[in-house]
């Protein structure tokens, strides 16, 4: 939780896989 940016990047990674 010390790196919120990592959370956003993970969401984008998952979203990209689902959006594919």
Swiss-Prot record:
Single annotated GO MF: DNA binding
Principal subcellular localization: cytoplasm
Gene Ontology CC terms, in alphabetical order: cytoplasm
Disulphide bridges, residue numbers: none
Subcellular location: Cytoplasm
Keyword DNA-binding: yes
Keyword vocabulary terms for this entry: Activator, Conjugation, Cytoplasm, DNA-binding, Plasmid, Transcription, Transcription regulation
Coiled coil: none
Functional summary from the UniProt entry: Conjugative DNA transfer (CDT) is the unidirectional transfer of ssDNA plasmid from a donor to a recipient cell. It is the central mechanism by which antibiotic resistance and virulence factors are propagated in bacterial populations. Part of the relaxosome, which facilitates a site- and strand-specific cut in the origin of transfer by TraI, at the nic site. Relaxosome formation requires binding of IHF and TraY to the oriT region, which then facilitates binding of TraI. Also positively regulates tra gene expression.
Subunit structure: Part of the relaxosome, a complex composed of plasmid encoded TraI, TraM, TraY and host-encoded IHF bound to the F plasmid origin of transfer (oriT). Interacts with TraM, probably through its C-terminus.
Family of the protein in this entry: Belongs to the TraY family.
Protein name: Relaxosome protein TraY
Organism: Escherichia coli
Gene for this chain: traY
